[in-house]
Structures are given as structure tokens and as C-alpha cells.
Amino acid sequence: MNIIEEIMTKLREDIRNIAIIAHVDHGKTTLVDELLKQSETLDARTELAERAMDSNDIEKERGITILAKNTAVAYNGTRINIMDTPGHADFGGEVERIMKMVDGVVLVVDAYEGTMPQTRFVLKKALEQDLVPIVVVNKIDKPSARPAEVVDEVLELFIELGADDDQLNFPVVYASAINGTSSLSDDPADQEATMAPIFDTIIDHIPAPVDNSDEPLQFQVSLLDYNDFVGRIGIGRVFRGTVKVGDQVTLSKLDGTTKNFRVTKLFGFFGLERREIQEAKAGDLIAVSGMEDIFVGETITPTDAVEALPILHIDEPTLQMTFLVNNSPFAGKEGKWVTSRKVEERLQAELQTDVSLRVDPTDSPDKWTVSGRGELHLSILIETMRREGYELQVSRPEVIVKEIDGVKCEPFERVQIDTPEEYQGSVIQSLSERKGEMLDMISTGNGQTRLVFLVPARGLIGYSTEFLSMTRGYGIMNHTFDQYLPLIPGEIGGRHRGALVSIDAGKATTYSIMSIEERGTIFVNPGTEVYEGMIIGENSRENDLTVNITKAKQMTNVRSATKDQTAVIKTPRILTLEESLEFLNDDEYMEVTPESIRLRKQILNKAEREKANKKKKSAE
């Protein structure tokens, strides 16, 4: 037997391990759903829900994938393990670890939008791991589809990211995941009602895992899960050897220590289910339970052959904010979990599975510094806690400054904007004011321009709302972390207008709103309960303005209360959680409960606020 034949005998041809990566909303999760439907995995009677791979309510509502999911499909006797990864760079910690578990990637790109910032981010991670790529140009049925140009853009991106010759020779499949069609031709007329071209391309091009099941076990934890019945679960790949239920094994910890434990349960992935199995071999993607304090990057080996794999690198947080117990006048009225103990327990529980998150104590037992990969990362955590019944307050997000080689540095983001040409001047000016550097400007046809900028992350805090207003809602902005660069001195970004602040507690009245709305934009409806120091709108000028929004019209013998019913006021602007976060200034908090999102001044009393401001100015 020659060397080539010997190597061939050591491959597990019955398995392929792939990750599906893409920009947000390019159809990745829909594609996975369709692969599940058309494979031999699901029972014919099984009805698959739309976005079946997205298990989290927020994921389904926003159409984004936050947590990596794993599933497996069977096709012509081959088991294809599929990792569905987040498409947003804020969840890049997940993306990096998944790349360690697979041998190839399916890159999904929109046939019209082409390559986007997050496409760049996830592809860079895949190429760094020397993974074999396949490109699926999705949404080929769009009237505006430009598949040939998009493939050229993908090739340019591969070259720019340093792909080797083998990676540059990627196969391309054209598909419409929502219609369940695909083809090797870029002509939409050639689409076939089958996913077979994608399945066949995966099996033909993605390498089979090496079968070294007879060697000592090596299993590395890439993801974490938690189950009330079995405790903490480590999900990862068996890189070498075999593991069975009941095996006595050693866990090599991140700090260099080791712990012995018994494998109590093993789980394999079948369709959308996680099923108990008795044994797993090299190349399998599995879940292991039995060790309560198992963590991402740690290695499981036999007790008599301890050999840890290199620790997985996890991107550091770039943004932080203060989480506080809710101490507003309305504290405890709407939430189930309101105490510092409950809030801290919930934050610590999040650390069990989210390794890109940091939670640090402060000098107060009611405050914590929470750091993450971006605004989206932290806003998802806040929204999740609010849905679970928690009350809390958070401060304005701020970037994390690092010292690199003795130089203070801050995070910069690569920003890509698609806007009608008529707004490009305003966009360029606004990002230049936020210390952005324009890298590229391309006319994409149909009166559209694509702008690419490098902008300090500080400059993007609160920019989204301004951008949408500037482009009348027609602009599309995507951004992703690029690198740390020397800190730019001075203030960047921030809110240009002051707040309208309630001076009294009570219910907002139509009468008061009518007199106040000429001063700015109102955030509350008539009848909304307010308190002193609560922000009820945005001033049209730079300064904060204290107003009485609870004042009722005095009744006279001539006029009656029914007269007010004909009063017409402007529709208030009700802020979303993200918009509220963007609105915040340094002296303000966002109050979050299961029922409400409120903005408030940190110091509620007007006289005390003015006193603190004078003290601050004299100190400067």
C-alpha cells in the first residue's frame, strides 16, 4: 500500500463538517432550513417552522442569528454536520470558535448586495483557519440580481484577505433558498427545484475528517450550553480518539491545572434534535456533560495521556456600559426580578455561555461594568433580561481604550454605507465630523452610491438615528470592528441637542404636550406616568430644558374638559431600546422593565443637577 492509499484509508468519508457563514439577512438560516427539508433527516410528516435554526425569540423577530447552532443532515449516506454561525461581528467570538470545529465553509452571499462588512469579517476568520470555501450566491431570483459581478467581488475579497491558490479556486452554486432551488449555472432560468447541487458540491469539495479513532482522545470545547437536568454542557469536536459514556477522563483547564471527571452523557446532533449517544469518534461534533465548571477552549483527554490542544483565542470586548439596579421612583412596579442579588446572578449566568462578555464589580454593590463586542451584543442582553422579568438601568455605552506598545489606542470600525446619491454629501460630512476617513466611494447604479469609511467606534455611538434621518430612511449602514488605532484626542460624536426633562411627577396631559411640542420632539403619549427627572423628549436646542408635562387645563364655567378632546397633538416618537441607548448622554440612564423603556437624568432633582454641573465646570 503506498502513502496516498494509506492516508485515504484514514479519512471518515461518511462525515463532512461545515459552517455556514454570511452577512446578516443574506438568507443563511433560510438555506439551512431548506437543506434540512430536502435531506433524508426529517420525518416526512415533520413540518419545519420558518427560521427553524433560530431558537431564540429575539433572533426570530430581528432575523439575525446570535448564537451558533448545530444540526446534522444525511445525504446519500453521508452525514453533514452544519454549524449555523452569527452573521454580525458583535457575536464574532462564536464565529471564531466554530471555525475550529469544521473543515470547510459555505459562504452565502446575496446576489444583489454582494460582499458586505460582516461577510468580510467571517470570511477572514475562515481563511485564517485554512478552511476550504464554497460560495453560494443566494436570492438569484431577485430582479436586481447581478450574480457575475458578485462572484467577481467575492474573488477580489478573497485576494484582499490573503487567500491561498486553493482557496481562490472556490466552486460556486447559485440558489434561491426561499424557493428551494439551486444550480451550477448563474442563469436564473436554469434553477432546479432541488438542493442537490449544494449537497453534491459539499461532499465533493469539503475534505472528510481524518480518522484517527485508535489514538488517545482529544476533544476541545468550542461552545457552551446549560441544561437544568445535566448542568453545564461542552460542545465541540472529537479531534482524535474515541469517547464513551462512563469514561474517566481529564479536563485540561485554561489556567494549566487539570481535573478528572466521568463522562455522564454524550449527545449527537440529528436534524434539529440533540440525542443521547453512547460513543463518539474522531471527526464527530458532539456535546459532553459531567463536568460542572467546563469552559470554552479546554481539552478533554484520557487520564493517562493528557495532551491539551492550543487554547482558543477569543476577541476582546470593545465597548462597555454600567448596569445598575433600578432605583427610579417607579422601581419594583413592573418587574419580577429587581434586587442587586438577582441582577448579579443573571449576569453571572450569562457568562456561563457567552465568552465574549465581561462582568466586573464596581465600588458599589448595586453597579457592574459590563463589556461586550458592540452595541448590538449588549442591547440583546438587555432585551433578553427585560423579557425574563428583570428591572435594571444602564449608562451610555463607551469604548474600551487599550494601551498598545505604550500608546493609548481605541477601536475603529469599517463602515459601509449604501445611500441615494443626493444624500452622499451629508453622509460624508457627518462621518468626517466624527473623525471618519473615507476609504472608497463607488457608484453602484440606479442613483445609488456605496461609501466605505474607517471610523472611531466612539463616533458611531448614537449615529444610527442621525444617519436614518439624514437619508430619509433610504440609507443602509453596516459596520464591523476593524482594528485598534491611536486614540484621537477630544470629544467625538455625542448628542447635539438637549433633553426635555420633567420637573414634576404625575400623568402627561394633552394640554401640556401641546404647549411643549413646539420646543422639540415628545417621547411620551398623553396619560403616561412620569416622574421628576424623567426625559420626556428631545429639545430643539443644545441645552436641557425642564418642563411641566403634567399640568392640566384649568376648568372655568364657560369652558369644560370636553373641549380638550378636540385638541390635536403630533404623534410622539416612541424610542426603541437601541434608539434609547443611542440617545443617552453621560449624565443619563436608560431604565428598563418588562413593560417600559424610560430615559432619565442620573440626578433627578433639578436644583441638585444644576449644583453638580457647576461643580463639574469649576473642576474643569
Give names to the regions the model predicted:
Residues 1-620:
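Structural and coupling elements of P-loop NTPases
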